[in-house]
Amino acid sequence: MAGVDSGKLIGSEIHGFHTLQDLDIQTMLDEAYSRWLRPNEIHALLCNHKFFTINVKPVNLPKSGTIVLFDRKMLRNFRKDGHNWKKKKDGKTIKEAHEHLKVGNEERIHVYYAHGEDTPTFVRRCYWLLDKSQEHIVLVHYRETHEVHAAPATPGNSYSSSITDHLSPKIVAEDTSSGVHNTCNTGFEVRSNSLGSRNHEIRLHEINTLDWDELLVPADISNQSHPTEEDMLYFTEQLQTAPRGSVKQGNHLAGYNGSVDIPSFPGLEDPVYQNNNSCGAGEFSSQHSHCGVDPNLQRRDFSATVTDQPGDALLNNGYGSQDSFGRWVNNFISDSPGSVDDPSLEAVYTPGQDSSTPPTVFHSHSDIPEQVFNITDVSPAWAYSTEKTKILVTGFFHDSFQHLGRSNLICICGELRVPAEFLQMGVYRCFLPPQSPGVVNLYLSVDGNKPISQLFSFEHRSVQFIEKAIPQDDQLYKWEEFEFQVRLAHLLFTSSNKISVLTSKISPENLLEAKKLASRTSHLLNSWAYLMKSIQANEVPFDQARDHLFELTLKNRLKEWLLEKVIENRNTKEYDSKGLGVIHLCAVLGYTWSILLFSWANISLDFRDKQGWTALHWAAYYGREKMVAALLSAGARPNLVTDPTKEFLGGCTAADLAQQKGYDGLAAFLAEKCLVAQFKDMQTAGNISGNLETIKAEKSSNPGNANEEEQSLKDTLAAYRTAAEAAARIQGAFREHELKVRSSAVRFASKEEEAKNIIAAMKIQHAFRNFEVRRKIAAAARIQYRFQTWKMRREFLNMRKKAIRIQAAFRGFQVRRQYQKITWSVGVLEKAILRWRLKRKGFRGLQVSQPDEKEGSEAVEDFYKTSQKQAEERLERSVVKVQAMFRSKKAQQDYRRMKLAHEEAQLEYDGMQELDQMATEES
């Protein structure tokens, strides 16, 4: 299953998930081995199948925990998975049970489940919606269970708050000690029926595999059943005797040697479960001072906050599930360095946190003498392992350390040490580079070793849904990028002409330009100093420092190379083994910093390689949006065309190359810029007068309070108007120029020669018209002849069929006449024996039935309709190409992102030019 990382989900008013982040696909896939999907999760997946991959072939021998999507209309045999399933009595049909699942208060999902023939505990479930418009999408879940021939454990109503019938008789009141209001009721029902200890493990497994909202009871305080001391004592003894590993999700809590604070409910007086040697096993106390628990241990009481919220809001909360609670408890126990009853231990959870966000645990270590900074929030609480992520750490300094409030700190995330930049009082920002997936500890430090804050569990997640336009996988893409880097470095270091530069005579103008370029690029020395300082302070990771070193080396070498070219009167005709120059390789790699260096050196950005491609062509071909923005802001021409090839005889623009690679938004942006640039060139040449009205209207328009989607559509409409107006003005200029050329030719031509030319033209036109008429007549005659020939042949074939049938009937008649003697000789026997014994008519000859003559169907091909259909398809394709950006929201978003990047690059380039001009005036 793959899809996009974020997006609004369809049917959120039914299943309760608004985005993919709320749905938490990764956690769902991880838990697919140990539990069935809930009805609201299934409904969300089936309604939003466009975000995931639809399998086109059946899976072969899927393992436990496998979840796949199929299209029943496209793949009828999706159940042929290679497993041997239980059959019906006929031994052929798979024995599948059928039920309807409820989402909310209505039945919305079909479920068909089958058991394995060889392994009865291996179960397959097939889900699809009752909605006729979406019933073709099927979700299939395979799982190894602990029950045989059991009904689906998925509750019929995912929002139900009643305890189901298969709940164990002994249940202890439990709740998370976080600030999440996920308990919309006041307690749990405790039943007094006693069962044998031999079934305890099965019951405990059933309890821990229930959904969290199945354990909730109606919020009727008067009718609640309160747990007795005998019930609690029984459950405590069972928890002590339960072996480790026998319970999933919540098993760490049963095997943990410590105390767990259970929040209070109406009717229960602060029950605390103790499992240590200082107190009897299974004892419950209503006072925190009993059994060695510190009465100052911080806890949270939810009885006041629960009653203030409606039940639906609490059930829709991200942590309203038992699995999330189990993960929180597991992290709490695994990260805790000591006993739970340690007063220094404090479990903090952010209220209202999404279910896709990992549980955050703060705890202090005994080796920390004092906490200087108290972290209250870290945003975001997780990051993708393949991306560089910006982290905001919020908190406050203790009163005795307020003088450190404006100092920069160091953020320690696992083995990484990155600088934490001060933004405002109590807020720090740091950038985490890509790391391997996993959960690490995050804290702040002054010297990079000793923590000054509590620890924060930070998770690096693996990317499951990638939405990039790069067709190669990540490894091949990295190798390709590395190859371009090697080619650039080789070209820069092998094309040096220092000896010829030093021995040749340098003109004063070139020497002055070289000095200006050297003064403008003097800031590169500061970059070396900053890199050395960062490495010595151990503020950057090794991979990031290595990349900075390589990039800084290329910058300095490019600076020296440009100085040589300026002295050599800007002779830059050096290519690598594949015909690319330095600026083209920089464009492919997306090195936007090189554009400013080329601009300062006054070297053309439209320098072509051996194929006639410019840097803008290469940047558009590889989808380098920032590089395209930097080139356009520096003055690169978007209307240049590559050299003609066999596939494209007229050459390609940068927009054509971007469209070939699937970058529709970038192609639309470059196409608009190409038309505007062509218009400005013709305006400069004097072929067009006036300006584009759409550009004026766009500059004067106010975006207002439009959202992102409306703004993207507005930009798309503005781009279409600009392109249409520019194209119309250019075509009008072409027609006007052609009319002027014809008028001038008529004006300066002599009358005799003009008359001769007119007569010759009339003769040619007359001859051409006669030729066209004769050709059409000949073509019509050939068509008519072929049609008549075909018609005559068809009639001949029909007549031959009839003649063959007549001949066959006649031959049969002759054969029957030859056998009349035999028929007469057996007549007596027929009458005497057959009539007497069989009591029926005798043999009277062969009755030949005349076959029905079927005329062949007349299939006359209509050439005019075929040609008309082809013409309509051509017109439709043309319209699709023009309106491509209107049909794709992704293209509109790409266009807007490209537009904003260009505006930002233009402002940055203008600012650098102003600073350079001010520095020149001062000097």
Curated annotation (Swiss-Prot):
Region of interest (Calmodulin-binding), residue spans: 824-846
DNA-binding positions: 25-151
Residue intervals passing through the bilayer: none
Induction (free text): By heat shock, UVB, wounding, abscisic acid, H(2)O(2) and salicylic acid.
Keyword check for Repeat: yes
Domain IQ: start-end pairs: 757-786, 799-828, 875-904
Keywords linked to the UniProt accession: Activator, ANK repeat, Calcium, Calmodulin-binding, Coiled coil, DNA-binding, Nucleus, Repeat, Stress response, Transcription, Transcription regulation
Tissue expression remark: Expressed in roots, stems, leaves, pollen, top of sepals and siliques.
InterPro entries listed in its UniProt record: Ankyrin_rpt, Ankyrin_rpt-contain_sf, CG-1_dom, Ig-like_fold, Ig_E-set, IQ_motif_EF-hand-BS
Family matches, as Pfam families: Ank_2 (PF12796), CG-1 (PF03859), IQ (PF00612)
Gene Ontology molecular function, alphabetical: calmodulin binding; DNA-binding transcription factor activity; double-stranded DNA binding; sequence-specific DNA binding; transcription coregulator activity
Subcellular location: Nucleus
ANK repeat start and end residues: 611-640
Signal peptide bounds: none
This protein's record includes keyword rRNA-binding: no
Gene Ontology BP term (one): cellular response to cold
A cellular-component GO term for this protein: nucleus
Region annotation (Transcription activation) ranges: 272-372
Coiled coil ranges: 887-914
Protein's job: Transcription activator. Binds to the DNA consensus sequence 5'-[ACG]CGCG[GTC]-3'. Regulates transcriptional activity in response to calcium signals. Binds calmodulin in a calcium-dependent manner. Involved in response to cold. Contributes together with CAMTA3 to the positive regulation of the cold-induced expression of DREB1A/CBF3, DREB1B/CBF1 and DREB1C/CBF2.
Family: Belongs to the CAMTA family.
Protein name, per record: Calmodulin-binding transcription activator 5
